[in-house]
Curated annotation (Swiss-Prot):
The gene is rpsF. It holds the Pfam family Ribosomal_S6. Residues 104-123 have a biased composition (Basic and acidic residues). Belongs to the bacterial ribosomal protein bS6 family. PANTHER family: MITOCHONDRIAL 28S RIBOSOMAL PROTEIN S6 (PTHR21011), SMALL RIBOSOMAL SUBUNIT PROTEIN BS6M (PTHR21011:SF1). This is Small ribosomal subunit protein bS6.
Amino acid sequence: MRHYEIVFMVHPDQSEQVAGMIERYTGSITEAGGKIHRLEDWGRRQLAYPINKLHKAHYVLMNVEADQAVIDELETAFRYNDAVLRNMIMRTKAAITEPSIMLKQKEERAPRREAEAKEFAAE
């Protein structure tokens, strides 16, 4: 089995369905004997450039270990799902399990935002 990093972007109007999509895709990987090493839901983020006249999308990152047949199945699922705007599947040399830079930045900003909210509420 090979290691892959998968990133897909979902239409912002379909953000509620992202949890179901993640469950479906991870289920197909694990049913085929694959493993999920890292799963991150980055949430709705600004796009670098408009895609289909959209300026935001919901991002999901997965690092998996799976067979090529499972990856082909995922690629087909992404292609025929209208809610998936873009996807990228890259083969990696080893399993990546540490949090990504995006998640680290999000975690660093959370306490600062809470402190700012408390200051604003106190005023």
